[in-house]
A protein has these predicted regions:
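Flexible loop and strand-edge segments within Gram-negative outer membrane beta-barrel domains
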Residues: 70-148, 180, 186, 190-193, ...
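Gram-negative outer-membrane beta-barrel transporters
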Residues: 331-334, 353-442
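Transmembrane beta-barrel wall of Gram-negative outer-membrane proteins
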Residues: 7-32, 46-83, 99-118, 159-160
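Signature of Gram-negative outer-membrane beta-barrel scaffolds
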Residues: 168-269, 280, 398
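Outer membrane beta-barrel strand-and-loop segments of large Gram-negative receptors
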Residues: 148-152, 194, 202-204, 300-304, ...
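Transmembrane beta-strands of outer-membrane beta-barrel pores
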Residues: 8-10, 19-21, 32-36, 79-83, ...
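Surface-exposed extracellular loop regions of Gram-negative outer-membrane beta-barrel proteins
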Residues: 128, 175-187, 229-238, 262, ...
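C-terminal beta-signal and adjacent terminal beta-strands/loops
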Residues: 425, 434-451, 468-470, 476-536
Length: 536
């Protein structure tokens, strides 16, 4: 069986069928966008943005084999890549950002009885991120990635219809490449002697019970025991002895979680949750640039695991025989052991090493309200979702100890979708999204002293990028089904009003009037901001 589609921006194809009748089957699917190909005629060699573009492709495959009535094997794989490139000859700048994931998994399902089920998995995953930038006689390449080897076993036991018990264990071996850099400035070339890597072991045991205590009250209680060990060499400064020493540490924690649902009546209920969580892998991001240069850093002796407490409570109501669903939910999350780059530190300054001098440690919180209205029945269906939230950070060594918004703080997030069945053959659809822009830190001035560039910044995350919003509309025509062939035609317009949503902002050095950029030697230089948009 084949299923596919050819569009103006992308194409897809899915193949599936039996390998051995009643024994095994397969599915293979792939996608590829070709925005980069379509944009080439509009970006000739005379265009300042020639060489810019974006595309992604992915491939998914899965094979399942029925060993017996109680045993099944599944082998699956995924490979995907996104590639973004930007060039502006007016500023003599070029940026390339390829990234993606690859995973392979082998899964065995076994049914012990009608009450006990087991799922065992072996998983390998590979994440790669690369950032390349070149301007005038300066070049920089940052590479980071994570390889994970994971094995886990999960059990599901259902003694009766009111009680479901889950328990299991998992282990992951991590290999980090948190940030390796190569570069060139004029005739000076920087090449590390070797690729810098870190290694760690992470394991967990868990148990949870989902039980209906009464017809009105349902409770889910769980407990997770987690452990983490950093097994690679890492150096930290001993400020008393004024020297760097190798140090490692093991972390072990208990993570409880509790959720409940209480039915007030057949159409309304209250839901609540409390969770504790330890995160052993940190996202180290810098707000000094809005480029996607975030790096993943493992916990160690000098970098403790991130800890969070989260509370949530919500009211849910269905109306008109479940035609409408409504919900309002509030949450509060408190976090400790967060990391941020110190003032003036960029990811490229800390690649090929892992000194604690690069990071500051602090706290944060996140809270908000989520609203949902959904229509499930009738010719016209859809939903409206809105989130009002705030996420802040507190660091003694950052922003003079004053509270500042997190890089990914999103004050407003709105989604509206609608689908209308015009007839048996025609379906109309639309999607509108709006989101507050990311917070970034702007450079106010740069000084060129002895060939080195020094930068002064505004307050941390004191500037908001423009909000992201767009409207998509579409129409799908499905002709009468033929004997062996089913087809449909989809007509859609992406970004109806041609909104230039920001992807990132970069800053170019602007020489004083009458001076060529490549001739800047000493003095003050004014950084000028440029916004880059993928679409339109």
């Amino acid at each position: 069986q084949a299923d596919g589609g050819i569009g103006l921006l992308s194409s897809r194809l899915t193949l599936q069928g039996p390998v051995q009748k009643n024994k095994s089957s397969f599915i293979l699917s792939g996608r590829r966008t070709y925005v980069d190909v379509l944009s080439k005629p509009f970006l000739n060699e005379d265009n300042a943005f020639s060489g810019s573009g974006y595309y992604f492709y992915d491939l998914t495959t899965k094979i399942n084999y029925r060993i017996s009535d109680k045993d099944r094997l599944y082998l699956s794989g995924y490979f995907g890549r996104d590639v973004f490139s930007f060039a502006n000859s007016d500023n003599d700048i070029g940026i390339g950002i390829p990234w993606g994931n690859a995973t392979t998994s082998l899964r065995w399902n076994h049914l012990f009885s009608d009450k006990l089920f087991m799922n065992t998995s072996l998983i390998f995953s590979d994440y790669r991120f690369e950032f390349n930038i070149a301007q005038s006689d300066f070049e920089l390449k940052i590479f980071s990635g994570i390889n994970d080897w994971n094995t886990k076993v999960d059990f599901l036991y259902q003694p009766n219809q009111r009680n479901t018990i889950k328990f299991g264990a998992n282990y992951t071996y991590h290999e980090f490449t948190p940030g390796n850099a190569t570069g060139r400035s004029g005739e000076v070339v920087f090449e590390p002697d070797e690729i810098y890597r870190q290694y760690s072991n992470e394991g967990a045991l868990y148990f949870s019970d989902d039980i209906e205590i009464t017809d009105a009250l349902k409770v889910h209680a769980g407990l997770r025991y987690s452990s983490f060990q950093h097994s690679g060499y890492i150096s930290f400064r001993d400020y008393i002895k004024n020297e760097f020493t190798a140090s490692q540490d093991n972390y072990r924690h208990i993570e409880p979680r509790l959720t409940f649902r209480y039915k007030l009546n057949p159409t309304s209920s209250i839901k609540g949750a409390y969770t504790q969580n330890y995160q052993y892998i940190h996202l180290a991001s810098t707000s000094a640039v809005s480029l996607p240069t975030d790096l993943w850093i493992p916990s160690s002796s000098g970098i403790e695991p991130k800890f969070s407490d989260q509370f949530a409570i919500g009211y849910f109501k269905n109306l008109k025989d479940n035609m409408y669903e409504t919900a309002i939910e509030g949450y509060y999350k408190e976090m400790t052991n967060l990391i941020e780059y110190k003032e003036g530190i960029l990811p490229e300054d800390n690649t090929n090493s892992n000194s604690d001098d690069a990071f500051a440690f602090g706290e944060g919180d996140s809270y908000g309200i989520e609203l949902l209205i959904k229509k499930n029945k009738g010719k016209t269906t859809g939903w409206i979702g809105y989130t009002l939230s705030k996420t802040t950070r507190y660091f003694d060594e950052v922003n003079n100890g004053i509270e500042f918004p997190a890089k990914y703080d999103r004050r407003h997030d709105l989604s509206i979708t609608a689908t209308h069945n015009l007839s048996k053959k025609w379906v109309l659809s639309s999607v509108f999204v709006y989101a507050t822009g990311n917070s970034i830190t702007l450079p106010t001035e740069r000084y060129v002293i002895a060939g080195n560039v020094y930068t002064e910044y505004t307050s941390r995350n004191g500037f908001r990028m423009e909000p992201y919003h767009r409207l998509d509309i579409g129409a799908t025509y499905t002709p009468k089904k033929k004997r062996k062939f089913q087809s449909s035609w989809n007509f859609s317009i992406y970004n109806v009003y041609s909104r230039k949503n920001p992807y990132f902002i970069y800053f170019a050095l602007e020489a004083p009037e009458g001076v060529d950029n490549g001739s800047i030697q000493e003095g003050n230089v004014t950084p000028k901001a440029y916004q880059v948009s993928i679409f339109p």
